[in-house]
Structures are given as C-alpha cells and as structure tokens.
C-alpha cells in the first residue's frame, strides 16, 4: 500500500472521530445557547485542520511523484551506461611501432605513446626493428619493460627477390617483408585480436588511444569496415573544421599512417601478402572488396620532421604531409554514440547533408561564396564528371588531387569533403557520367603531384 493511501485512510479516521466529537459537543452545547461562540470556534478549528491536512497530502503526493521520476531516470541512465559500456573494447590492443634506422625518431614517437597511454596492460607497445642499427635498439632498450622490442633478420641480409626493374624500390620490398613478420608476431605468436600500426616518424594526439579503443567495436560488428585510420589526407588546417574534433567519417580510401585492423582481416591477408608495395596492394579492389575505413575530421597522427628521411625520400612531405594538423584537444570518444558511423546510418546522414542541405554551385562561384561572412555555417556541393574535372576542382580547393585504384583520397561513395572559411564543401560525382570508381583514373604529369 502506497504511503499516500495510508495517510488518506488515517486522515479519514481522524476526521470521523473529530466529527463524532463535534456532534457530541454540539448536542451538549445546544442545551446551553450561551455557548454559540464555542461552537463556531470548533468549526473554525475543523476547517483549519482540513486545509492543513490537504496541504500535507499534496506535498506527499509530489514527493512520491519525484521519487518515481528519479527512479525512472536512473533506470534510463543505467541502461545507457550498460549499452555504452558494451561498446568499450575490453581486450588489449597492442601498438606495433615499425622502425629501422632513425634512433631519435623512434625515441620521440615512443615517448609520446607512453605519455598518452592510459594503461600498459590495455595498450602494450611493441617496437619492431628491421635494420641492424644499434642506436635504434639502444634507444628502445632505455624504455625498459614499458615496451617490448623485437628484431628479426634485417631485410638487406634476407636475400629478398626484387625484380630488376624495381631495384630503386628495394626499400618497399623490405618494408612489406617487415610488416608480414611483425604482424605475424602480433596475431600468431601473441594471439592478439587487433593491432594499432604506427611508424617511428609519426606524431600522435592526446586522444589517440581513446579514438582507437572507442571505434574498435565498429570493426567487430560491421563487415563493411576493415580499418580505422588516424589520418586525414586533406587534414591541413585551412581545409578542416577546427571546431569538429569529435567528427568522424567512413571512407573508401585506405590511408594508413596510424591505423587499426583486426586479427580476422590479417588472417585473410597474410596468405596472399605481397612482396612489395603493401599499401597500394591493399587499395586494389580485389583486396578492398568495397570495404571502408573510419577516419577523423582532424588527424590523430601527424608527420614529424623525420618523415622526409623515409623510404619515399620525402615525396609529398613538404607540400602535404608536413602540413597535416594533429588534433590537440582530448576527446573522450567513449562518451560519444558512434553508431552514426554504421553503414545505413552514415549513408542516410550523408545523403541528407550533401544532396538535400548543401547548395549546388559551380567551382568558380564557390570562391566568392566562401569569402562572404554571411555564408558561414552553410554547405555547398560541386559536381565533377571525370578524373580531369576532379583534379582541377580539387586543385582550386587546395586538397590532394590524386587517386589510388581510382579512389580519391578520403572519398566516401565518390564524395570528398573539406571545410574552408566556415563553409562545408563537397565534391560530388555526377552519377550520370561517373557511375563508380574507375581504377584507370590517374593524374597526368602536367598536373604535378
């Protein structure tokens, strides 16, 4: 029985007793007409008592209502907490750091990883070295038991078969071999279910680990995903929304440069792993199989100055890589519902933002549109009808204009987005002329890098 009901019964009982008392009092008092004042006083007392008890009952009813509402609210909050907790990946996610002969680079990179790492048990760091460089080994050993160091026969001593026409690309063959050996160590020897892959010339953001651990459940539950990357190829400060540090996207483009994959994906790729150029090999439609990656608006990795000394001899470094902005604000992705990145949700969201909310303009009109302060917060779309058209329009927006297996960098369903002067801009394929990605698309030499 509720408290209000009990109080009401007691009140009725008291009221009946009081009424009997008053009636008896009235009977006695009517014998004496001189006691009229006493009768009126009794009636007034009864009226005041009724008002007082009514207020008490109303107050108690309000308290009961609040208690019920609070219980319901706590129940909803608990359900949300349980739901979100189920999305937090419980298994360890090792960070596999690839190194060769840059001692200071690996020192700086590992220092950053340790500084931002919330737990050594959750995020063990494994540094794998390919070259016989004692300085690198010594720098890694200084970290003691904070990291694991692994070493195998160096690539220059492994008698790798390299086609005569590819002698100048020898480093890429050694790197592919290194990746296979190190990833087998993580997934076969150690038995981990996922890995974050980094290179010794990368800078990282304060929320690097939050980003990867909170997106891991997406990799597990979405068969259309095969990686989470920390890198935005168009992540120069003038091309991104600096207020959108928590914004993430799906992308058909495999970027690398700080990325995560599952053991399931590795067990698929390992038997057919290439002898060279592993990243372009992964971008091939035969391997990608229309799968996608998660990428951020603001990169969670950046390129340190050591990058210009890498295997690519600084290709793209000064013009693009060195200019990528690394996020400097901590975002707790564990408190954000990332289900909007699931395939159907993201497709619906993108269609709304691109085809319904954005205004269609020519690339020439976009230039004047972004200069007007009145247009801040608006979005526009620019259509393209082929690779040359895309290259020209990308150049006007100062974003990367190249393709890998026909996929523009950062593209999702052919759509490439950037953010300039407060305006969201979408480069969108004209589906009457561009039906799908074309692996034959390339950049003519006349357009440069």
Swiss-Prot record:
Membrane topology, as annotated: Single-pass type II membrane protein
Glycosylation sites: 28, 159
UniProt cofactor(s): Mn(2+)
GO biological process: protein N-linked glycosylation
Binding site for Mn(2+): 201
Species of provenance: Caenorhabditis elegans
Pfam families per UniProt: GNT-I
Keywords: Cytoplasm, Disulfide bond, Glycoprotein, Glycosyltransferase, Golgi apparatus, Manganese, Membrane, Metal-binding, Signal-anchor, Transferase, Transmembrane, Transmembrane helix
EC top class, as a word: transferase
Name the record gives this protein: Putative alpha-1,3-mannosyl-glycoprotein 2-beta-N-acetylglucosaminyltransferase
Lumenal topological domain: 24-449
Record topology, Cytoplasmic segments: 1-6
